[in-house]
Amino acid sequence: MSRPRRRGRDVHGVLLLDKPQGVSSNDVLQKVKRIFNANRAGHTGALDPLATGMLPICLGEATKFSQYLLDSDKRYRVIARLGQRTDTSDADGNVIEERAIGFSATDLELALESFRGTTQQVPSMYSALKYQGRKLYEYARQGLTVPREAREITVYELQFIRWEGDELELEIHCSKGTYIRTIIDDLGEQLGCGAHVIYLRRLQVAIYPTERMVTLEQLAALAEQAQTQEHSLSLSLDSLLMPMESPVIDFPEVNLPPVVAGYLKLGQAVQAANAPLNGMVRITEGDAHKFIGMGEIDGDGRVAPRRLVVEFPV
């Protein structure tokens, strides 16, 4: 029996969506998928409904490499409300404690310094991490607290922007798995007044340029202009996409002659000139350096296929 035909276009690449406030990451993912009429789509790390900013959305074959963006560094701009702590550590939650603001500028700098570098962070109960098969926020909504292991995070840069009254603004460049809400909650406790997030914007993921972000409104306008005709859609929308290999562009490249690449596509490990001694590599084919997927250097120094792109007829 033949496989059922997938609905939608074979469109491949990464869209840098400027996520609006007040909607979930999955909601905007589905909207982008419909606008592009794409057969496959996936985002690369959810943003809270309150948050805005860069949400890379992988389409088609690019979804195979979304994990590499989940593992990448992020940069955020955050504004905290001082003097109030909420159950979710952001403005979407309920205020559970109010305290006076009584710290000095010196106290603030000392507190900020303690978050720079590599530290251990206990995730919020209001997160999508799982405990015994259920997401933490499902327990939290039932008023339950379950054990969470501290996880290692790295804050590469924590820049003070401003402190005015009960508002504190920071810019944070951090490693994967860092919860900005938790940093703000922990900072509020160190300062003795409590704090929660009232504004959060993701400025950057990996090395993707901020100026390449597009809004849902811009996408919808282009799609309407194209009158949903497939050829017009590709001309109007596909030019907005980053290449499908962009999530793995920082990995070492191994370029294979077409004949050798053919064996790799059949699942065989192959010898390659100038390959690194170990680790994951980005594999390209021929003089055009066409991206064909990711491989790993095996114990014999050969390139073994790990995640390859399916080739579609043009």
Curated annotation (Swiss-Prot):
UniProt-annotated binding residues for substrate: H43, Y76, Y179, L200
Pfam families assigned: TruB-C_2 (PF09157), TruB_C_2 (PF16198), TruB_N (PF01509)
GO terms for biological process, alphabetical: mRNA pseudouridine synthesis; tRNA pseudouridine synthesis
Keywords of this entry: Isomerase, tRNA processing
A GO MF label: tRNA pseudouridine(55) synthase activity
Protein family membership: Belongs to the pseudouridine synthase TruB family. Type 1 subfamily.
Name recorded for this polypeptide: tRNA pseudouridine synthase B
Annotated organism of origin: Pectobacterium atrosepticum (strain SCRI 1043 / ATCC BAA-672) (Erwinia carotovora subsp. atroseptica)
